[in-house]
Regions:
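Pyridoxal 5′-phosphate
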Residues: 1-389
Length: 389
């Protein structure tokens, strides 16, 4: 099978798995049991990896919390800030095209009496397609806003948000700015020493690390704003009482290794992946009349280089997937693809429900090859033609 669903997950880099193995088999000490050498060894390894992670994000190591993944990180960031006992503000602002791990959290807050504003994004035919409407954002944020939460890059259409502008709008009213950076970390430059974001969420499995481990940064932006969190998990006091539970050295080491590789190899990988996306798109355009792109222009400043989202004339994406089973791709977010509803991201772009159902997403990754892309084009075009006669 040709795997073109790297926004859902990425394969674990063999070099990452190699670094994990000793900590799964040989060095199994509890990093919080430091009365003996095995525990101290595990703690030291975690501390080293936290330093690596923090350095690549432009923050201090003590500003990184280890979680089970970005879903937990988003919950901890949003709920933790809004439900802290000293939080007096009762307003949250987000975008209409966030991941469900953000939208569902703010919906729960709304049910509990918080005021939630969901800002639309520019439509598919706009020059800034997929980017949040900054004028509407500025009008919505007020002195009661506790948090603005907007993703760094979108998991379906790959749009990169104007982070500096969002940060400025959030901070001038005294709100904190959280970003679900799951699709950005390891793919593009995420430098919190340069971009004034207070908290970000990420998952290792999106940048060729293992599943089940992620992070939440709480540095408070360039200004070092105070971030008060009410913990979700209690019962051990680990990670400064903000996230209880025994940390897994193998997972933390793997995430540090994966991020190190992703950052150091980013320029080379981006060139290859961008070329393969162009190869795939050009092949599909030549083979399928009327195929149309969804989302922003294929420019690095606006869109993740490996992302391609397009819609078909005449058939639904699910049917195309079934007819092209040699290629792994998707019709939307893997975290919510069991939902019968069309993608809220695509309808948020202004597409009709029919257009959204006729859309698919490809995610090209560093382990793909041009030969795979050529074969994928053959399979995809043949699959489409088998459905349309």
């Amino acid at each position: 099978m040709i795997y073109l669903d790297n926004h859902a997950t990425t394969p674990c880099d063999p070099r990452v798995a190699e670094q994990m193995m000793p900590w799964l088999v040989e060095h199994f000490g509890n990093p919080h049991s430091t009365s003996h050498e095995m525990g101290r060894q595990a703690k030291s390894a975690i501390d080293t990896s936290l330093g690596v992670i923090a350095s690549h994000l432009g923050i201090a190591p003590d500003s990184v919390l280890i979680t089970s993944g970005a879903t937990e990180s988003n919950n901890l960031a949003i709920d933790g800030i809004c439900r802290h006992p000293r939080q007096r503000r009762r307003h949250v602002v987000t975008s209409t095209i966030e991941h469900p791990a953000v939208l569902d959290v703010v919906a729960r807050l709304e049910k509990d009496g918080f005021r939630v504003t969901r800002i639309p994004v520019h439509s598919n035919d706009h020059e800034l397609a997929g980017q949040i409407d900054l004028d509407q954002l500025a009008a919505a944020v007020d002195d009661d806003t506790a948090l603005v939460s907007v993703h760094w890059a979108n998991n379906e259409i790959g749009v990169i948000q104007p982070m500096e502008s969002i940060a400025e709008i959030a901070h001038r009213s005294g709100a904190l700015f959280h970003s679900d950076a799951t699709q950005a970390v390891g793919r593009i430059d995420v430098d919190l020493g340069r971009v004034d974001v207070d908290l970000i969420s990420a998952s290792a499995h999106k940048f060729y690390g293992p599943k089940g481990v992620g992070l939440l940064t709480i540095a408070g932006g360039i200004a070092g704003r105070r971030v008060r969190l009410k913990p979700i998990l209690v019962g051990g006091g680990q990670q400064r009482n903000l996230r209880s539970g025994t940390m897994a050295p193998a997972n933390v080491i793997a995430m540090g290794t994966a991020l190190e590789l992703a950052v150091t190899e980013s320029a080379q990988v981006a060139e290859r992946v961008s070329a393969m996306r162009s190869q795939l798109w050009n092949g599909l355009v030549q083979g399928i009349d009327g195929i149309f792109p969804n989302g922003p222009l294929h420019e690095r400043s606006r869109r993740l280089v490996g992302n391609l989202n397009c819609r078909l004339p005449g058939i639904e994406g699910e049917s195309w997937m079934a007819a092209s089973s040699e290629v792994a791709f998707s019709s939307g977010s893997a975290c919510s693809s069991v939902d019968a509803k069309p993608s809220h991201v695509l309808t948020g772009l202004g597409l009709s429900e029919s257009e959204a159902r006729r859309s698919v997403r490809f995610g090209i990754g560093k382990f793909n090859t041009p030969d795979q892309i050529d074969r994928a084009i053959e399979v995809l075009v043949a699959g489409y033609r088998s459905l349309t006669g």
